[in-house]
Structures are given as structure tokens and as C-alpha cells.
Amino acid sequence: MSGHNKWSTIKHKKGAADAKRGKIFTKIIKEISVAAKLGGGDPAANPRLRTAIDKAKGENMPKDNIERAIKKGTGGMEGVVYEEIVYEGYGPGGVAVLVEVMTDNRNRTVSEVRSIFTKCNGNMGEAGCVAWMFDKKGVISYDTSLDFDQLFEAALEAGAEDVVEEDEQIEVYTEPSSFIEVRDALEAKGFKFQSAEITMIPQTQVALEGKQAESMLKMMDRLEDCDDVQNVYANFDISADEMEKMM
């Protein structure tokens, strides 16, 4: 069940995260507002909202920004109405790509996303064309300085599906329905997580190199740079040696 964070690892190496902090805030604020609208403004009774708030705190978002986003979602403040859509398609080399968006203008967004696919040697597909290649899972990441055996035992006892160590992290995998329960149970035992999210994990990966690898990274960058895009998932793999050539 490994490999879900390939793009995150690459972004970290490229040093791209800090440069896009403003866009990260915008995306999290959208998620908080939509979560509050759908499930109410109480994080204790709304797991999706609680997860979004935790992510905001992890990015050091000011408390006032979080509270305003919740109020916009619950109707306490005037705000934009967003629609959630998932676009699917193929990148270079036949890589499967899922794009989650929140938009107030469906026509504008689909035009932007389709343009990015086309310019990066990919193409958009019909709904359902690649979604079956991914599994929705909770992923909780920890520093490798923690005792793996202790974390492994505690995680399985709390209801986790699997625990693996890779890319200088220990990752605990859960079903989406037990994600919050497992995360909180481990935190109560002193295991502080670095990140925690519900994400889409590819069942298989497509190895890329050369021009295809460059085009795929360009596609990921441009999609994430799109204001309406919340998350991008793709089942590509680029070796460390290949990354060194492109850096």
C-alpha cells in the first residue's frame, strides 16, 4: 500500500511547498467552508471539518482565518457557494490522474483543467475511467525517530489496516471510516503525527523517465497551481536517479 506520497516527496525536494503557501491557505479555507456547510460548524461532530482544521493548524493558518471560513460555510457570513467535482484522465505514458476541484464556475474550471491535460501530453476522460485504479484510505504519517514496533502494535490495536516505513516516514493506513478514531487513539498514547489525511492511493504505478517524467511533473505542477483544484492524485513513479537528472 506504499507509494501514495511520491508527488509530495518530489515537491519537497523541489522546494515548491513554501512558494505556494498562499495557494495552500486558499485551498484549505475552501475545504473548511464546504465541510462546515455539509456537516455543521462543530468539529467534534464533523470529522471532515476537524481534519481540515487540523490541516490548517499544521500550516500555521491564523485562528481568525479558520473561524471566518467556518462562518462562511454555516451561513454566519456571506460567502461563495462551491461545487465539488472530480475530473479524470490520463497523463504522459498512460498515467491515471484524478483531479478534485471546488468551483463556483464549472465551465471555467473544466476548461482550465482540460487545457492543462492537453498541453502536458495527456487527455481528459469520462467519469469513472480511472477512479477504479485508486483506493480511498486514511494515511497518518510519523517521524522515523519513533519506535516502529511500538507504533505498529498500537496502530493495529486501534484498528489500522497496515503500517509501513518508507521515504523517511512511518505511515499508518486506515479505512476512511476509522481514520479519526485511529489517529486520536495513537495520539492519546503519545504518538504525535506529522500529517494526517484521507487520500487516494494507486493500486499500481507507472514508471516514467525522460520527457514523459518531465511532462508529468509539469502537469502536476500546473494542476495544483490552478485555483479551483484541491487535490491531484496520479499513479506515476519516478526513480531517484531519474529525479537527480531533472533537478
UniProtKB/Swiss-Prot annotation:
| Keyword Cytoplasm set for record | yes
Specify the superkingdom: Bacteria
**InterPro entries from the entry?**
Integrase-like_N, TACO1_YebC-like_2nd/3rd_dom, TACO1_YebC_N, Transcrip_reg_TACO1-like, Transcrip_reg_TACO1-like_dom3, YebC-like
Q: Provide an example Pfam family for this protein.
A: TACO1_YebC_N
A single GO cellular-component term from the record reads:
cytosol
Subcellular localization is given as:
Cytoplasm
User: Which first-to-last residue range defines the signal peptide?
Assistant: none
Q: Which UniProt keywords apply?
A: Cytoplasm, DNA-binding, Transcription, Transcription regulation
Primary place of residence? cytoplasm
Q: What GO terms are given for molecular function? A: DNA binding
**A GO biological process held by the record:** regulation of DNA-templated transcription
PANTHER family to which the protein is assigned, alphabetical: TRANSCRIPTIONAL REGULATORY PROTEIN YEBC-RELATED, TRANSLATIONAL ACTIVATOR OF CYTOCHROME C OXIDASE 1
Q: Which family does it belong to?
A: Belongs to the TACO1 family.
- Protein name, UniProt field: Probable transcriptional regulatory protein Glov_1245
